[in-house]
Amino acid sequence: MNHAHSQALFARAQARIPGGVNSPVRAFRGVGGDPVFFREGAGAWLTDVDGNRYVDLVGSWGPLILGHAYPPILDAIIDAARRGSSYGAPHADEVEFAELICATMPAVEMVRLVSSGTEATVAAIRVARGFTGREHILKFEGCFHGAGDPFLVKAGSGVETLGLPDSPGVPSALAKLTLTAPFNDLAAVERIFAENGQDIACAIIEPVVGNMGVLVPKPGYLEGLQALCQKHGVLLVLDEVMTGFRLSRGGAQELYGLKPDLTTMAKVIGGGMPMGAYGGRRDIMEKVAPAGPVYQSGTLSGNPVAVAAGLACLKALAAPGTYARLEEVSRMLEVGLLAEAKAADVPVTVNRVGSMLTVFFTGEPVYDYTSAKKADTARFGKFFHAMLNESVYLPPSQFEAAFVSLAIGEPEVAHVLAAARKAFRSLGKTG
């Protein structure tokens, strides 16, 4: 497969953009080689600058649940842009959007729009601290909540791929306010709360981890965490940046029957445009300025073009049978990938919840940061490039989730599994 134009663009990019990319995991450091540069996407397919086409299992890292260039979203974007790309003032669509989010997400009574997932999580932590008067937060090893300073402690995802346990530039005094516990270990949370509970403002967690690869919560784990938070007066912040409107229409909180105090959202709610949000209990959200004293603002918050895209996306997802169809296709991929790996005698573990999945190159169960780290990243890199050569675009890191879109049908599933058959067999021969 020819990638000459991609290679030339990457050489140019490295002269002006740090590492040649605008987000670290895109640089292919986790798999080796040079990144592919793309020129367009349509439905389930991406086309690169050299004209190669790929079934896309990245989906812009989660937002594109309806696939690329979904016509109703494009129409909404064009119509909104014709009326003005930004107002810097209130408008009717943002009210409708807020009402739709609150009507759909079980624990969200009020919501504030922002422009990214990181902005949402940083603001949620500030609100939790302001509401409780406490300074410490608890996060979970391998969970990634964006690039905000409080979260770059055992953060997984691109940080792990780069081999950086934390990021330089995060003050040690600030890092000390972030406590960590292993994912799926309630006993560890109990110990931390027993020792520090009176100082902890909130526990923030990805209900299904997507940034250490997909980690599935053990039965009762999330419910137990919620109960411990309530016992100790610690706010539960559910980071649904990935899972919101993806695992079910009401996100992971609907799927697992949770009632978090605060929820963060992004990705799917923007329909492919820059969008984030945080919301939750009315008494907490009324502390946000200008209703209350906790300050947060943004020039492009509630941007009319992004809101129009988000509205079109969420309305499309409300169609009957949408999530059942997404589950069916995702399950076909999971079962097929496991079967092809087994046929090639390549030990893997496939973790999946809904339309999020990861193929871990280990035969052992993967349920937390430590077990995920045991995966064979070199072997994953070989698998990634073998799949790329067979026109399948996977996340370029062992520690990222693949995302299935509604644009993927049986022909695309067959294409992916045929590619996987060749890729697994090549690994079986060469290691």
UniProtKB/Swiss-Prot annotation:
Cited Gene3D superfamilies: Aspartate Aminotransferase, domain 1, Type I PLP-dependent aspartate aminotransferase-like (Major domain)
Molecular function via GO: glutamate-1-semialdehyde 2,1-aminomutase activity; pyridoxal phosphate binding; transaminase activity
GO cellular component entries: cytoplasm
Family: Belongs to the class-III pyridoxal-phosphate-dependent aminotransferase family. HemL subfamily.
Pathway annotation from the record: Porphyrin-containing compound metabolism; protoporphyrin-IX biosynthesis; 5-aminolevulinate from L-glutamyl-tRNA(Glu): step 2/2
Subunit field text: Homodimer.
Name under which the protein is recorded: Glutamate-1-semialdehyde 2,1-aminomutase
Positions of post-translational N6-(pyridoxal phosphate)lysine modification: 267
